[in-house]
Amino acid sequence: MKASLPHTQSGPIGPLTPHLYMPDARRPIRAKLQRLGTDTRVVPHRHPWAQLAVSATGVVRLTVAHGTYIVPPSRALWIPPGVEHAVTVLSTADLLTLYLHQPRGRCGPQVAAAQQAAWQQCRVLEVSDLLRALALELDATADGAGPPLSADALRREGRLCALVLDELRRALPVPLGVDLPADKRLRALCEAVLAEPGRHTTLEGWARDCGASPRTVARLFRSELGTSFVQWRQQVLLARAVALAARRMPMAAIAAELGYASPSAFSAMVRRSVGATPSRFLGS
């Protein structure tokens, strides 16, 4: 790792200094490394370049206007230019942020024009061992105030950047995003489910908590998110399972935490949802 980590930060963080890490054609990828304590909150912000958030250790949650994403060490989140986002640390994390130069009118890790649409949305990606190693080799400082790079260091950084972009283009998307509504009533219910998804297993239980009828809540899910409560909650459970697995929680304990009667019932849900075994999906 090219930079020593600073002391652990906690609580709300802001104002930010993204200009210190601004990428450009000469240095197309800039890296920032921070150690953030549990419950640290980074204020909503945006910047005119793309971002790849990689949790080297720990688990973070990134929230945008219409969704939230869980990022454990085996995954990363791509954030397109101009998208406002906030960060909440779920367990103490070494957060490596890559800022990527995006030429005018382009979006993505130097992909063909026909592939750019997929990169204009936030997406969770698998992080290969090679991508992680390359990203950690980039020159990273906690405050962007490192000394100027030598000519040899700049050439090496250029080669590393090319390899990072190549690995990023090959990274597979993972369904760990959870859509969030604009309606305040439904948003409050969704935040409650995200905070404690195993509290209730039925729509009736959650509707009772928020003082609305199940029919009203079901209608709001359809009109606001275009999905059913059951389908939406399933995405929450998948995201929470990944976060728990990153803390090395056993499969049986994860199943119980999420309200499943048995590990086999939880495994069946994962296979049905993502077409992969729990161990493969959870990165364990």
Question: Which residues does each predicted region cover?
Answer:
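…primarily DNA-binding HTH/wHTH and HhH modules…
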Residues: 1-14, 246-247, 268-284
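Generic protein-terminus/edge-of-domain signal
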Residues: 1-60
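Short hydrophobic/aromatic patch on the recognition helix
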Residues: 74, 217, 221, 265-266, ...
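Short, Lys/Arg-enriched, Trp-marked, Pro/Gly-tolerant hinge/linker segments that flank
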Residues: 120-121, 145-210, 223-235
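Short acidic-glycine-tyrosine-enriched beta hairpin
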Residues: 66-81
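Terminal helix-turn-helix DNA-binding modules in bacterial transcription factors
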Residues: 200, 204, 223-263, 283-284
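Alpha-helical residues within the helix-turn-helix
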Residues: 208, 219, 223, 256-257, ...
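Ligand-binding loop in jelly-roll beta-barrel domains
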Residues: 82-110
